[in-house]
Amino acid sequence: MNNFFLLVSTWPVTVKPRGLGTSKNLTGQYDLQLSNKSLALVRKDTKEPMIELELISVRRCGHTDCFFYMELGRSAVTGAGELWIQVDDQIIAQNMHEAILG
């Protein structure tokens, strides 16, 4: 079995103070990194990974305007809840949604 991770995409994002952003103290600016198995929020200032979420823990996701959101299940390291992420424009939010679903 092959256990390596392949980085697919990286987006500059801002986690908003809503849902898990507040309850897990995740609000702030990050790079959201998508690999073939997970999503990682990497702090802009320290370049340190804050959390890594397995893709199988994402129950559903979507986008509206300049926001991308994910509903995470109980198996996520954060526990169940929503994560709201702001990006620079609507097209980026749509691209994130399509890439993560793919």
Where are these regions (language model features)?
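N-terminal recruitment modules of adaptor/scaffold proteins
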Residues: 1-52, 56-67, 71-102
